[in-house]
């Protein structure tokens, strides 16, 4: 894949061999060329992805910070998933955007290794935090009495981040600043054995995509079965309650109690399960083309590695970091409603306090009153009760 910007993308390698292109016999006479039209399309797409990912996830974090329900377990996982998406945007999308603009990596060897390391950290973190949130929803539905406690949540998230940092370590050893043509240097992967690219890309695909998807499918299979059981119980209990007679009055009352219990489960948790399921679906849709072309390129020597569709497919993975904030907004719209209300409320108070013609004494008095009463009055006027 020498000469294509996609060669710089995350775990994408010089897939033709296990050595840098400059060491495959004779060096090329000059630096390879690229498709400039395709490069401009890549730059435009990456600019859009970067803007949407940064703005969307920043709004999510701000909304979670200002909500009165910030200690919710679901919101805790949403916060860390948004942080992981920001890591993807800053350390994966942004370097790739700069790389597409400059065509070659311009920087020291240490920066090359660091960028490659952080690119994969974002991939691992986004995947495994989503997996952790899905496991939490599975426990909440299937075994509510054994669901994770707050201390366990924090330890699980901390362990996930540490595991992602460790799992990404091979990038530091594999990538380095190499001479890819006469006088031309780039951040490139080097393998000792010719089967190295196959082994490494296959491992990344298993660790970041195949194994998590299998676990996610098992989680939502269990969740679906439990919900089906509850709905069936609810229907049967409602029928038994409707048939209540004098002889079965106690059974009818018990059935009504069971109906009420099922309703509580549905209202409190089904919506969060739906949200997590849509996030998982977006993850699969966005990452499948990326890993498909990665595996194709290492296992098929005749793969069209420089084709436009091949390269664009690798850009789709980052769309996942753009989709998640919109999914949050769809299912927890009250978060953004509160954020907008607080913004307009604070803006109105600022404008009111900045009216011309007021004396300095009155300004000082108004400012002091605002500071003292901000916590109580602004919360009463600017925030709405959550519907979660």
From Swiss-Prot:
Pfam families: 7tm_1
GO biological process: cellular response to hormone stimulus; digestive tract development; eating behavior; ERK1 and ERK2 cascade; estrous cycle; female pregnancy; G protein-coupled receptor signaling pathway; heart development
Cytoplasmic topological domain residue ranges: 64-74, 136-154, 226-274, 332-388
PROSITE patterns: G_PROTEIN_RECEP_F1_1, G_PROTEIN_RECEP_F1_2
Region: Disordered, residue numbers: 1-32, 354-388
Modified residues (Phosphoserine): 365, 367
Lineage, opening ranks: Eukaryota, Metazoa, Chordata, Craniata, Vertebrata
Sorted UniProt keywords: Cell membrane, Disulfide bond, G-protein coupled receptor, Glycoprotein, Membrane, Phosphoprotein, Receptor, Transducer, Transmembrane, Transmembrane helix
Originating organism: Rattus norvegicus
Role this protein plays: Receptor for oxytocin. The activity of this receptor is mediated by G proteins which activate a phosphatidylinositol-calcium second messenger system.
Protein name per Swiss-Prot or TrEMBL: Oxytocin receptor
